[in-house]
């Protein structure tokens, strides 16, 4: 059994919390996020920290308390520090260019792929083969990175494609005669 909900979420300086019923609002230096807390989870605000408790002791409620604690912790980290995901383009002629809220990708197709970034997400291209996705919502940053990777996932023979910076691509040997 996980005991995630027993650990309190520490609030760094500059992070404000508002709790109105089951609606939790977190505001920080980088922005603001909101979360609708499940009715079976009780949020307790102490000095400088948040604690979570299940209203009853059944397993689903305890699991929901742990999930809520993890989501709120990610929100606190997001509004104070932010999240980023790095992607690499591997392949001849593969390149990326960020133009405002549009990421233009050349991935070996007969046409360029233009990806419209959602609100709250910023893409930077330090080089033509590196993409940096930044934002305050951990789930959204990961989702955008996954959608960009899905345009051309790394293939196992030459390793060409879009990959996460920390991803290890399993390589296969070419077929022998």
UniProtKB/Swiss-Prot annotation:
<comment type="function">
    <text>This protein binds to the 23S rRNA, and is important in its secondary structure. It is located near the subunit interface in the base of the L7/L12 stalk, and near the tRNA binding site of the peptidyltransferase center.</text>
</comment>
<dbReference type="GO" id="GO:0022625">
    <property type="term" value="C:cytosolic large ribosomal subunit"/>
</dbReference>
<keyword id="KW-0694">RNA-binding</keyword>
<dbReference type="InterPro" id="IPR019906">
    <property type="entry name" value="Ribosomal_uL6_bac-type"/>
</dbReference>
<protein>
    <recommendedName>
        <fullName>Large ribosomal subunit protein uL6</fullName>
    </recommendedName>
</protein>
<dbReference type="GO" id="GO:0002181">
    <property type="term" value="P:cytoplasmic translation"/>
</dbReference>
<dbReference type="InterPro" id="IPR036789">
    <property type="entry name" value="Ribosomal_uL6-like_a/b-dom_sf"/>
</dbReference>
<keyword id="KW-0689">Ribosomal protein</keyword>
<dbReference type="GO" id="GO:0019843">
    <property type="term" value="F:rRNA binding"/>
</dbReference>
<keyword id="KW-0699">rRNA-binding</keyword>
<dbReference type="Pfam" id="PF00347">
    <property type="entry name" value="Ribosomal_L6"/>
</dbReference>
<comment type="similarity">
    <text>Belongs to the universal ribosomal protein uL6 family.</text>
</comment>
<dbReference type="InterPro" id="IPR020040">
    <property type="entry name" value="Ribosomal_uL6_a/b-dom"/>
</dbReference>
<comment type="subunit">
    <text>Part of the 50S ribosomal subunit.</text>
</comment>
<keyword id="KW-0687">Ribonucleoprotein</keyword>
<dbReference type="InterPro" id="IPR002358">
    <property type="entry name" value="Ribosomal_uL6_CS"/>
</dbReference>
<dbReference type="GO" id="GO:0003735">
    <property type="term" value="F:structural constituent of ribosome"/>
</dbReference>
<dbReference type="InterPro" id="IPR000702">
    <property type="entry name" value="Ribosomal_uL6-like"/>
</dbReference>
